[in-house]
Amino acid sequence: MRVAQVMAGAPAGGAELFFERLSVALTRAGETVLPVIRRDPARARRLAHEGLAPVQLGFGGPLDLLTGPRLARALEGFAPRVVIAWMGRAARFARRGRWVLVGRLGGFYDLRRFRRCEHLVGNTRGLVAWITAQGWPPRRAHYLPNFVLDMAGAKPLPRAALGVPDGAKLVLALGRLHRNKGFDVLIRALPRLPDAHALIAGEGPERAALEALARAEGVAARVHLPGWREDTAGRLASCDVLACPSRHEPLGNVVIEGWSARVPVVAAAAQGPAELLTPDRDGLLVPREDALALAEALGAVLRDPASGRALAEAGRARFEADFAEAPVLARWRAFLASVEKP
């Protein structure tokens, strides 16, 4: 099948990285995939390395009069059966044609941007329920989860390379330094975890505020903000527990990454983690914005490694059943076959 995937997103982010993984997986499975991306030489190189030939376009603001016609020409030349527009900006530029237009949502976006789409895909059941509650026909709304790379078996990084003393407990958090991610809640929890260090791997507009909060809480020496890093698997292998303290998290790819790496997960009960986790079985859930509850849950895992291992093994089982590449790719291919234009 010929499938075009249109992504106008940022260089880093959960949706953008899954777009790459899915494009590569579909290609390896024998589908013919055209990735159309916002100009990003690094993403283009990664896709080209996997044998794809990405088209790079501007995907600018309201004054961008060039991307629409160029996208239309690229799609007409490729002649896909299905076009998948990832998120609102791509859907705004995509037009109907001799293909089925699918919008893929990873959050609670304005559905007016997807008005030309014939089908919508959400990556959580809660998101699909929200889509249909807005009046979208249920038969044209579909749940298709993400898959993440299998990170089990990675070699732990030396504590010194992470800036963490030998013997210290390590709490890992991953994501953009944005208020939605709730990393300030994790920092406020840290004074109640005197033997633990927090490694918050990501970059974003909240860096200065998080650094100031760490100083104010007296934990600056135990909070590490290394920026974006490629070695996620090594960091997961090095930590004692993964924290996902988000205020707002439609899915929570990091939860699934933690499961894949056999790491115990403690998450705030935002939309995605609350749907993913079975409390006290494959992770621990705490109320959002509750530093005390977060500290208690993290402390419980750090004090009782056996219970943490049990959570981690149950999470690994969930990953293998529902979020590994093979089962998710099979669902995507079945969906594409069911909607493709003859």
Language model features: what each stretch is:
Residues 13-24, 169-192, 196, 205-211, ...:
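A conserved mid-protein helix/loop that constitutes part of the nucleotide-sugar donor-binding site
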Residues 36-37, 264-267:
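Short hydrophobic beta-strand element within catalytic cores of glycosyltransferases
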Residues 55, 118-154:
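Donor nucleotide-sugar binding/catalytic pocket of nucleotide-sugar-dependent glycosyltransferases
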Residues 63-67, 84-91, 105-106:
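Short His-centered aromatic/hydrophobic patch
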Residues 153-165, 307, 316:
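A short helix/loop element that forms part of the nucleotide-sugar donor recognition site in Leloir-type
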Residues 211, 300, 307-322, 328-331:
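A short, well-ordered alpha-helix in the C-terminal region of glycosyltransferases
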Residues 228, 247:
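Aromatic "clamp/platform" in nucleotide-sugar-dependent glycosyltransferases that forms part
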Residues 278-280, 284-291, 300-306:
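Conserved acidic donor-binding segment of nucleotide-sugar-dependent glycosyltransferases
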